A protein has these predicted regions:
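Heptad-repeat coiled-coil/leucine-zipper oligomerization helices
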Residues: 48, 54, 58-61, 68, ...
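Amphipathic, hydrophobic secondary-structure cores in small proteins
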Residues: 11-27, 33-57
Length: 84
């Protein structure tokens, strides 16, 4: 079932339609808003530029986490195969 959730990002309200719970959407929005605020504090940026830089930073974090996950899976497989 799709839920409509209103969130506030960079002082603007947005309605998000998702199958996720409203609580989960609010959690995501709070995280994104906090990251946008951190980026906006370091430089004078338009809201659009702050959103772009936030997206780039979050994508960087995601890709690094995926790389680390892959590395740990390989390490675990190596350990398991050594025990067989």
């Amino acid at each position: 079932m799709k839920n409509k959730t209103t969130v506030r990002l960079a002082g603007q309200e947005h309605t998000i339609v998702s199958t996720d719970t409203p609580e989960h959407i609010q959690r995501i929005a709070a995280y994104v808003d906090r990251r946008m605020g951190e980026i906006s504090q370091t430089a004078r940026l338009t809201p659009n530029m702050a959103a772009v830089l936030t997206a780039m930073n979050l994508a960087d974090d995601l890709l690094k986490a995926q790389d680390e996950n892959s590395r740990l899976r390989r390490e675990l497989m190596s350990i398991r195969s050594g025990q067989a």
